[in-house]
Every structure is written in C-alpha cells, then in structure tokens.
C-alpha cells in the first residue's frame, strides 16, 4: 500500500469516528441542514490528524479532500446496501448526508472556495448512482429537496437570492450530471413494462428537481425546440391487446377508428394540419364531426344524470328539512359511543387498518397497468373509456387536447411571428420535411380558421358554458395561459431575464406589545389577578367629567341663540352624531323628557312647547274604525253569501228528491175530495124535496149552456185543444182537476 492510499484510509477512519460522535439522526438531517457549530473548527479547517502527520506529502489539498470524501461515501453506502438491513441503510445514508453538509460548511476553508460546487455535485451524483432501488431513492430524496438552494449556488460561496439560480445547463458542474440524469429518466420511460408505483414516483421527483435547478429562462428548462408531444398512447404493454382482424363495423370499431384518425392527423401534428391542403382538412373534419357529436352527447347525458341526482337529493333534503337547509357534505360523521369503548371494535379496527397498510405497502412493488393512459391500440377499452357516462376523465382530456390544438393552429395561421418561430424550429429538427410553409392561399387560411373556430368556440366552449361553467372557465384560462406561454417562448423568455428580486431586507413591522388595562374579569387564581394590576397611568389622566345638568344648560343656550338669531344654517356633517352624544349624557337625568324628542326636532324638542294634538272627533273615529274593519266585514259578507248559497243548493236537492211524494199526496187529496163530494150529494138528496132538487139542477144546466159562446159552434171543436194542452202539461191538468173538485165541493156545501 502506498503512502497516499494509507493516508486516504486513515483519513476515512478519522471521518467515520468524527461523524459517528455527532448527535444527529437520519430523519432530522434529511429535512434540516447540519449547523456548522456542531462540527469542530479544526475539522472544518481540514486540520485532521492523518493530514497533519503527512502535510509534506500533500500537493493539492482540495483534490485529496474530494477523493477522501468520495471514498468515505462509497464505503458507507456499499456496506449498508450489502447488509440489506434497514438500520444499516439508514446509517449509510446518514454518513452520506453528513459528508455533503460538511462540503457546504467547509467551503470557505478550501484553497479554491469556488471548487466546492463541483465536489458537492459529484458526491451527490455518486449517492444517486449507489441507490439501487426506488424505495432507497425516495428515502434519501428529502435531503435534495431541502438543499435545493445549495445546488443553485453553483460555485458561489454566498447564497443566491430567492428565485434565482447560478446554474447553466451547458456548463459545469451541471452539464455532465444533467445528461446522466436525463439518461436515467429515459430508462425509466422505456422500462415502463416493469415499472411500479415507486418507479413513477421516483421519475416525477427527479424531473421536478431538474426543473427547479435551472431558471425559467434557461433553454433546457422549456420546450425551446417547439416539438409537439405524441406520448398520449400508453407504452405500457398492460394496456395493449393483440390485434385481431376487424371484419365487422361495430360502433366501438368505428369510434376507435375515428379517434385514432383524429389523433394521428390533428392532435399530434398541428403544424402539418395548419399548412396542409383543403382535401386533408376536409378528411379530418369528416372524422372529427361525428366523433365530437358522440362525445358531447355522452357529456350531455353525464350532466343530465348529475342534475337528476342533485334534484332528487335536494327534494329529499327539502322534505326532511322544511325550514332549514342541511348541507350534509360538510358534516363529519362521528363514531358512536358504543364503538369507541368496545374492545372488540377496537381490535377489529386496528386489524383492518394494519391489513390495509400492508396491502398498500406491498402494492407499491406490484406491476400494474397505467389506468390513466388512453389505450389507443385496444379498441374495446378505448370505446369504454370515452363512452362510460360515470367517468368523464378521458373525455375531458380529449376536449382539452382538441382545444389546445385548434388554438395553436389558429395562431399558426393568423400570426406571422408564431408561424416563423415554429417553421424555423420544425425545419431545424426535420430538414428534409416536405411541408410548404409559404404555399397557403387565402381560401385555405379561411377554411382552417373557420374549422378551428367552429370546433373550439361554437361546439366546445358554448356547450360547456351552459352545462359546466366551471370547466368552461378552466378551458378559457388554460388557453389564455398557453397563448402567453407561446408568446414568451417566441421572445426567448426575455421578460424573465431582467427579473430581479430585491436584496434589501424588509424590516419586520413594529408591534406595541405593552399591555393596557381597560377592563378586568376576575379569575380563580390570585396570581392571575395580580398580573392585571399593572400601573398604566390611565387613572392619573385629568379629564373633566360632563354632568347632565351642564349639558342640558349648554343645549338650551344653543337653542335659545338659534331662536334669537332666526337663522336656519345648514346641518353640520356630524350633527346627528353630536345629538346622539348629547342624548347619552342626558339619559341618566332627563330620560322621561325624551318623549318630546323625535327625528324632526332632535334635541331642540326638549325646549320647544309641546304642540297640542287635536282630538279626533267621533266621525273621524267612525271612518277610521270603518276602514279598519272593512276587510273583516268583507270576509263576513263572503261567509254569509257562501252559507246562503249552500242552503239554496241543499233546498233544491231536497225538492228534487221529494217530487214523487208530492205528486202522490196530490192524488190522494183529489180522491178524498171526490169521495166527500159524493157523500154530501147523497145526503142532500135524502134531506131535500124532489122539487127543489130538480129546480136547482135546471138552474145549473141553464147557466152552463148560457156560458158557452154561441159562435163557437159545436163543443167538439175545442176537444183537441184541451187534449193537446193536457198532453203537453199533465201537471196542469191534475191541478185544474183538483181545483175544480175543490170548487165543486165548496159549491155543493153552499147549496146544502
């Protein structure tokens, strides 16, 4: 072993012994930096015992320190990973974190302080390469998130201002590391068949970390090449199915064919569509129109179902809560008391959550399909994803992509700056392209603009403005943000280059924390009561207390001066407030005189003579009483009319029901009267002489004959008339007969 190798090994042992004595844990150091005060000054100054003994053999101390720290981290991580134990892994990560913090805290003591940035990036990249699984990567990653400002310092020894970064993508130390980390991301992207949830979590955190390292105006931090993403199709084999010969033209096959045609000819190639001929645009329109009709029809059913469910829920809530609206969405369910105190329930609950946690932890390592990806190659799955009414995620995703694409096409056709920018970027990436950017006539431009406006404005935005205003506002804001981002991209993000955050410290606001005693509520503790007994000096302030009598005299003097001057000046701005203050002062002494005060007189009403109120005469009282009781009388009249009408209807119904009885009664009366008449005649014949009876009969017959009209002819001419009248009105006939019988009876009685 050479002297240098022995020096390195001894230095590593020295660091292990020194770092092991620090009172710090892995959970604390990965979230909070290690303060420099915890490390001895000799350690930070590189006054290590092995180095002091061989100081003559050291030519480049900074390079030697870098080698020692790298070997220290590699040894710590290798031993921890080989043991495959949780405690050893945390010990290795703890040593690595302490080593990185040591580089930062000792940056001023280097021969070349600017070299600390390269060392920090190199050691950090070494640790990332040694983490052999996503779980260990995620365990260590809070350290990188908590030290993001250290990375932005680059080679500077002073911290950068908030929002700024000294890193440049094409310069060290980030240049090589950025390429290496992009290769890691590419491997994760290409190896998605075997990726688990933690792989995707690791990929997201690394991408987010790289985007935060560089400023926003850095070319590597945005899509400077203006390339269009075509990554909608899932690369995961779990979302694919074996292709079969599609002989039938079912609805799912037609739907999938139209969707794929629109996706490959419009969404992922807006530049080709914008500068294509009319036939190409018409072909896309023929596939897009029925596809959009079908999707919007399903969306309409989706919102109708939501509206119906809400109406049902609201009706139930209204029926249950007639006076109060119950918002059950904000109510937190409470656990019943018997479940809280039941040991059996507690054991079952703990077992359930333990099993659920185990399932979740084991599920992180399980291969699974990416369910949020659209399966373009699976016809049945694609049809179900976009036509399922209960799930609108995939439809909303397609609608957003369609709006962004049509909006970009409109900008390409109408804006010369946008067209020139995308043209230069496209030709730089595809120099052999056959797109003719200059051969776009007015008819073709008009057709493209009309098609994009019809799809985006007339179909999509108008539909969601009525059905879903919230999503409509989301689309509008995203489109506006996309236009602003495109404008900034064309300008090279120059507006962010001059963006500087002020380095002046904002002084904290001064608070008066002195206590002023205004009131006091007695507490049960005497010590607390004594705290309130603080001499504030408020009791020593001399303040003249106003008495009600003095205020009354001042108000009266003011009123008298107003009367004597006979001037009605304009009311002061705060006159109402002053009068209220005066009344508050007078309340304790002159409360029973306040009946003289009203809105018109104000305080002056206390001193004015009370006006005599004219007594109301009897006629006025009667009119007033009549007006008050008018509505009551109207209700009484309506009630009487209702009662009379009800009685009339009842009487009419009774008469209709009693008509047959009346008719029977009349007939019986007629028979009785006839029989009585015959009996009287027989009796009279027996009592009177025969001569008198004959004379009477003669008189009656002569009178009957004389009563007939001599011009009427034979009496038989009148028989049909009487018969017809009798047929037309049989009741009249019966009445006449009864009348005649009664008259005959009476005449018979007279004769008798």
Swiss-Prot record:
A Gene Ontology term for the protein's cellular component: nucleoplasmic THO complex
Native source species? Saccharomyces cerevisiae (strain ATCC 204508 / S288c)
Keywords assigned: Nucleus, Phosphoprotein, Transcription, Transcription regulation
Q: Is NADP found in the keyword set?
A: no
**Function (record text):** Component the THO subcomplex of the TREX complex, which operates in coupling transcription elongation to mRNA export. The THO complex is recruited to transcribed genes and moves along the gene with the elongating polymerase during transcription. THO is important for stabilizing nascent RNA in the RNA polymerase II elongation complex by preventing formation of DNA:RNA hybrids behind the elongating polymerase.
Quaternary state and partners of this protein? Answer: Component of the THO complex, which is composed of HPR1, MFT1, THO2 and THP2. Together with SUB2, TEX1 and YRA1, THO forms the transcription/export (TREX) complex. THO associates with DNA and RNA in vitro.
- Coiled-coil parts of chain: none
State the signal peptide span: none
Composition bias of kind Polar residues appears in: 720-752
**Keyword Transcription (UniProt):** yes
- Its recorded name reads THO complex subunit HPR1
Source organism lineage? Eukaryota, Fungi, Dikarya, Ascomycota, Saccharomycotina
Compositionally biased intervals (Basic and acidic residues): 692-702
Q: Which GO terms describe its molecular function?
A: molecular adaptor activity; nucleic acid binding
